[in-house]
Amino acid sequence: MSFQAPRRLLELAGQSLLRDQALAISVLDELPRELFPRLFVEAFTSRCCEVLKVMVQAWPFPCLPLGSLMKTPDLEILHYVVDGIDCLLAQKVRPRRWKLQVLEMRDVDENFWTIWSGARPLSCSPEAMSKRQTVEDCPRTGEKQPLKVFMDVCLKEKSVDEDLSFFSGWVQHRRRSVHLCCTKVVNYSMNILNFRNILETVYPDSIQVLEIWNMCWPCMVAEVSRYLSQMKNLRKLFISDGCGYLPSFESQGQLVAEFSSVFLRLEYLQMLYMRRIRFFEGYLDQLIRCLKSPLETLALTYGSLDEEDLKCLPWYPSLSQLKQLNLSHGTLRFIRLEPLRALLEKVAATLQTLFLVDCGIGDSKLRVILPALSRCSNLTTFCFHGNDTSMDGLKDLLRHTGRLSNLSLETYPAPRESLDNRGRVISELLTPLQAELMRILREVREPNRIFFGPVSCPCCGMSPTEQLEFNFCLRGRPA
């Protein structure tokens, strides 16, 4: 018998059962586990909601990856699913067969369904796949563990998405038996009141990534600080102030103290991104000294680092193992760069990505950091475009970066000699200068992906942003 034959038999058996929903419901307790995923898909596709409700109560696997089936919110089906869960939660003794620990609403486990539909060989069971997701998050103890609903939160508008609103309301009255878990929470523009309501619903220990793009007002800083202190497993924090808010001198110290103290509780923080956050100018050391564990990523962009801020960076153990450093679009023109050199020396063995884009670094400033830069032997990405550098300065820079054999992406400004009086590139001047710079570099190594001048992808026009996890299309090379 071919591999597809038993799959076809399972499919036919499921379809036959669903023709009589009452029969399907009555036999679920005796239904072989192998039939559950296929029958669930058939019931979902056919919108046999009563069957879905009962199947949830008898689900024989630790995880129900509903999100990979439900590509768009379907409130009717969600109502039946949670009704089934409610029936179970209301029972003092859980059914023998019930193993459900996680309702997965993210689109992360499509393999669970495709394996049992016959789309690919059965290399591992759904139970094994489900356990990979749930063992770490849902350790079994002697007492009943709360059911966990996993979903990501992305808040772009004034109103909340239908599925998030639905689960928030459902979990609100079941806090002891159901946890709404969101590994990633992103707020682009939602007002503070609605954002607060969401944070109060989400189980704080589940949040590993928090991005806030509208950190514009003191009240938002205060609210975020209060909830941030509860996110004990936070790995990545991104905060951005689109308004460029600058507090009064009297309130600045209070904001800094309140926000910095939160970091004492974030033991697992690895990535810190601060974009246009100006209320830390001159007070950065207060935040850095509160970091409990070594960071892998530090991004301080579109801000105005002053000299005191830069001075503190080399001296704290929490910055001694950086893999990514981004100081782009900051004002370094009038600041001594000896502290930056000291920091680069300190992280030379670990640093992989360095962004110094549009920092106002001229030839004299560049010479200060070159010896330390040439020691960063594991550097794979170096972005330096947007700075005011002469041809001689770039030659010197390439002689130092030429020693970095692991570089796979490097961007440099057009030499000052190729610009007109408005700072625009004159291509007729840039071309021969670029050829000379490439010759100098090739004397040491063959570059992989390298750009000179205003950086944009020749294929799609994209350019690296101030964020380190940019998607940069590099299917072609400049001529």
Curated annotation (Swiss-Prot):
Protein name: PRAME family member 19
Family that this chain belongs to: Belongs to the PRAME family.
Keywords, sorted A to Z: Leucine-rich repeat, Repeat
LRR repeats: 15-38, 97-124, 179-203, 204-230, 231-265, 266-291, 292-323, 324-342, 348-375, 376-400
Keyword Signal attributed: no
GO biological process, one term: positive regulation of cell population proliferation
Gene3D superfamilies listed in its UniProt record: Ribonuclease Inhibitor (3.80.10.10)
One MF annotation (Gene Ontology) recorded for this entry: ubiquitin-like ligase-substrate adaptor activity
Keyword DNA damage: no
Organism domain of life: Eukaryota
Gene Ontology CC terms: Cul2-RING ubiquitin ligase complex; cytoplasm
SUPFAM superfamilies on file: RNI-like
